[in-house]
Swiss-Prot record:
One of its GO terms (biological process) is glycyl-tRNA aminoacylation. Its EC number is 6.1.1.14. The lineage of its organism: Bacteria, Pseudomonadati, Pseudomonadota, Betaproteobacteria, Burkholderiales. This is Glycine--tRNA ligase beta subunit. PROSITE patterns: AA_TRNA_LIGASE_II_GLYAB (PS50861). It comes from the Bacteria. The keyword Transcription regulation does not apply. Keywords: Aminoacyl-tRNA synthetase, ATP-binding, Cytoplasm, Ligase, Nucleotide-binding, Protein biosynthesis. Its main location: cytoplasm.
Amino acid sequence: MNHQNLLVELFVEELPPKALQKLGDAFAGVLLEQLQAQGLTSAHSQLTAFASPRRLAAHITEVLPAAADKAVSQKLMPVAVGLDASGQPTPALLKKLAALGADAASVPQLKRVHDGKAEVLFFESMAKGALLADGLQKALDEAIAKLPIPKVMRYQLQDGWTSVHFVRPAHGLVALHGSEVLVGVQALGLTAGNTTHGHRFEASVDPVVIQSADSYAEQLRSEGAVIASFAERRAEIARQLQAAADRVGGGVRPIDDDALLDEVTALVERPNVLVCEFEKDFLAVPQECLILTMKANQKYFPLLDAEGKLTHQFLVVSNISPQDASAVIQGNERVVRPRLADAKFFFDQDRKKTLVSRVDQLAKVVYHNKLGTQGERVERVRHIAKAIATQLFTALAQGNAALDSQEGEIAQDYLLTCVDNAALLAKTDLVTDMVGEFPELQGIMGGYYAVSDGLPDEVAHAIEDHYKPRFAGDALPRENVGVVVALADKLETLVGMFGIGNLPTGDRDPFALRRHALGVIRMLVEKELPLDLDALLASAVPAFGDKIEDTSAQLADFIYDRLAGSLREQGYSAQEVDAVIALRPQRLALVPRQIEAVRAFATLEQAPALAAANKRVTNILKKAGEVDPHVNEELLQEPAEKDLYAALQRFVPEANAQFDSGDYTASLQTLAVLRAPVDAFFDDVMVNAEELALRLNRQGLLKKLHMAMNRVADLSRLAV
């Protein structure tokens, strides 16, 4: 059959920019999927999706004008029902055949197949393959129905009385197979043709008559002044942004923001990047405020210098390319000034009140109807932060003479004071004008206002950092004060929400509990904090009084699940992760070394046998119940059990010393020498001896082995 390339375009009014790329991919993807299902494509068909503010389109290679005919086998009825005793068709069979367009003459051609219960009659025929126009009609209907958009518009067609529903009103439909229009294809009250429209203002030809499916993109670019491909348009904008920054000079660069680049790509069809500027006086306002208002409200790209500081220049992606762009530049500069002036006004007004003076206002801000106000929340965070700071200082002071002294007490008092001040003030920027206008700046503005109030740097940094990490890969708080307050804030959220039953379900996680749990894990691990997980959770629960149930065990499971997922994402195998997590390690800071030790152990020749033996030991001890690890040497009778005991006495102290020093890899490698005596023990010794004393002694020996082998991880999880 004659393969030709297919082009389908739906020309519409301006589509929602944040959804455009997803809409384009979905529209094209469903078209291809439906055509494939109907046998209208080849094995080598390729899809290209197009999406611009006013069009969704798909180009599919090697599309057939009609699908191949195919044999169809239809089950009729059991032979006993369809044929009488003399082999003649029954009325039931004749009626069924008539419905299929056949008669008694076709009875000899019926196929008999045994389906496991009885012999059944099948009618075989050739079904005509679907014509492309019919197949595309079905595919187009499906693609329109399945567009991933939560809200659609209802609008009237040109006849004045028919209403249709779509994301935006549609005004044109192109359907070309090669250069031929697929006559009869319709969608949303439109009939397919070969004409579309280019840029509203800059098209050199209107309408654009598409000559063939393959000329679509080039004709739109040359005649319609439109870059139809989302990816090509995005790349062109990125190129122009960098070129404009290079023209400005001084090492400036446009802000790196993929979401903004995607949104701007969805707003223009012919991008033209222009350099604009604002008054330098506005740079006295925190740059986060200026950057956010330019990005969020105006879709501008701020320019940063080599040190990441905001400059007074910014880039605009225009949808028109006039010979003299001065009017466009001046218009954008005029529009941005009031936005920046508002930000400056908010900043100046907010600094007229100190953060401390705003604390009482938090009592009027509802946090959650079951957990009270932000004011109550602040008191809980203070309670938890104090407990964490005390635990942290105590752990750091162990073996540190400088901290375990009068100077250490002064340092502890300073830490506790800074932590308490930061926890008290961390949420106060929620009642400032700036954060009221830009909620994304919470924490950040608190840090600026703390500096303005003359608070210590540690407190200001902690207020700014206490929401960190906000997302995967985000920076962690800079100093211990910030880490403590950030931990307290996240634990307050986790313990509180779990305590009232607000758990994540499926894709729903409105309080970002998964992100909070990962934040706790990252801080404990990456900051190498000597803090125990259960102790942290235990310190948080009392802060809530009788408002919540104690769900610490359930929350710990949740955190370990997040930790396991994080480790798997880092490339560790499920067995390696299970081996470490099975012990529910309290010091999460030690987990990276533990799992690396397990990985190294798993490469040893002795590992499979020891893992299998460990699994066997685990099962034996589980059945035995409570087992005393004490071994009476006088009751050791068999050479194999004596050898195992001697090996344990010789190598376990060394392995334990290595474990206690934190060298987990060396500890496991030291224990690898136990393979031979362990194998011999299971070959030659009856653990469940009839004599009770012997049985208990041998169980005790295995308990001793089990305790030695499983300090780093549950090695039985490595057994295949």
